[in-house]
Regions:
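Aromatic- and histidine-enriched alpha-helix N-cap/loop-to-helix transition segments
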Residues: 43, 73, 182, 207-211
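Short, compositionally biased
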Residues: 93-191, 215-218, 222, 242-244, ...
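Short amphipathic alpha-helical segments
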Residues: 33, 168, 173-175, 201, ...
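Structured beta->alpha junctions
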Residues: 41, 52-55, 67, 179, ...
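Extended repeat-based scaffolds of very large eukaryotic assembly and lipid-transport proteins
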Residues: 1-101
């Protein structure tokens, strides 16, 4: 049995200047929770948020205050704690954008083993801002924190190609990218047209050339008043990997239960229909439709930029641009995080779409 006089993990101990715990008073209750919420260790603060629920409305208010914490980890923990509550007041708070203007959403992230069996499910929080395109059409943009990653594939990765070499370190500033590939409804709202072969307002737009995608970004920028563009190849892979190093953000392989590739579907599917995201809150990064990137085609990464910017100066073929992500009619190897392929900027196909990027303020 625990001795009630002994301090527990995360208890705040008040003992003046004495280095010994003997004779010190353990500050418990709601005041102890408040003190632990000032601790620089995020693990201590998260534990304090969980304990705060033991103290009624006053404790609940402390958790709500955690939504405005400077630390993303604390905001994340506070949101997940509150998301399980049923009070109308709490639900109303969670429906509103936070103090930074982001909409927080709970997402499910899964990991598979080499047999494509799900071995882990995690509840996480992603943050988005939402653009109103008119007539009820919205565009959700996910916040991607800046960071450094290894771009390309290691030599021992199954299914790799030489064009994914050499693997190299890239530092990417923070940015925003579409939660999903651009949908037909979104494309129609901005351009007034829908060229897609597989019709459906919530399916990804396809049969768009690189030039069509760039024109969409230009028109979107004019309408919204922010600068929208295609992702650089480095931004795309960084966003896809979402701090993973495996061939897919799910793990070593994928399954038709998690992605639309050359398997069961034989056409595009509605965006987000598999219900699982990567760690950054992005959907359909593997399969469904290929996605255009800004960059000109280079057959290897020799001389590639390392700052996350698009590689636009090329002497190989100025008409070739970059595709990423694979599609509904391609094998899994082509859907890997590192796979890259050239395509003529004027050509289009019923398996090629895109998603958009908006540069953002720095955070980590």
């Amino acid at each position: 049995m625990n001795n009630p006089q002994q301090p527990r993990e995360y208890d705040a101990v008040l003992g003046g200047n004495s280095p010994s715990l003997e004779g010190a008073a353990v500050l418990g209750g709601i005041e102890g929770v408040k003190l632990r919420l000032q601790n620089p260790d995020s693990k201590v603060r998260i534990a304090a948020l969980e304990q705060a629920l033991n103290y009624g409305k006053q404790g609940l208010d402390l958790v709500i205050a955690g939504l405005k914490d400077e630390s993303w980890a604390i905001q994340n923990a506070a949101y997940l704690i509150l998301n399980s509550r049923t009070e109308p007041r709490i639900k109303q708070i969670l429906q509103k954008p936070n103090h930074e203007g982001f909409k927080l959403q709970k997402i499910e992230v899964v990991t598979v083993n080499k047999f494509a069996e799900i071995i882990q499910r995690q509840q996480r929080v992603a943050r988005y801002f939402i653009e109103d395109l008119g007539n009820g059409v919205k565009l959700e943009m996910a916040a991607i924190p800046g960071g450094t990653f290894m771009m390309g594939s290691p030599e021992n990765e199954i299914g790799r190609h030489d064009k994914e070499s050499p693997q190299h370190q890239v530092s990417v500033p923070s940015f925003f990218i579409g939660k999903y590939p651009v949908t037909q409804a979104q494309y129609q709202a901005i351009t007034g047209t829908n060229p897609s072969y597989f019709k459906g307002s919530n399916r990804p737009v396809e049969k768009v050339s690189w030039k069509n995608a760039v024109t969409f970004c230009e028109k979107l920028s004019q309408k919204i008043g922010k600068s929208y563009r295609l992702p650089s190849e480095a931004e795309w892979e960084y966003a896809c990997r979402a701090r993973t190093t495996t061939p897919f953000h799910f793990g070593d392989t994928i399954t038709t239960d998690l992605a639309n590739y050359n398997g069961n579907y034989k056409e595009t599917t509605e965006v987000g229909s598999f219900g699982v995201a990567n760690n950054f809150g992005l959907y359909d990064m593997h399969g469904n439709v290929w996605e255009w990137c800004q960059d000109s085609w280079h057959s290897s990464y020799k001389g590639a930029p390392t700052d996350g910017s698009a590689w636009l100066d090329t002497e190989e073929n100025t008409n070739l641009k970059l595709l990423r992500g694979g599609s509904w009619c391609y094998n899994p190897d082509y859907c890997r995080s590192a796979f890259r392929d050239p395509y003529n900027l004027d050509d289009l196909n019923f398996n090629i779409g895109f998603r958009v990027v908006c540069s953002g303020a720095a955070w980590t």
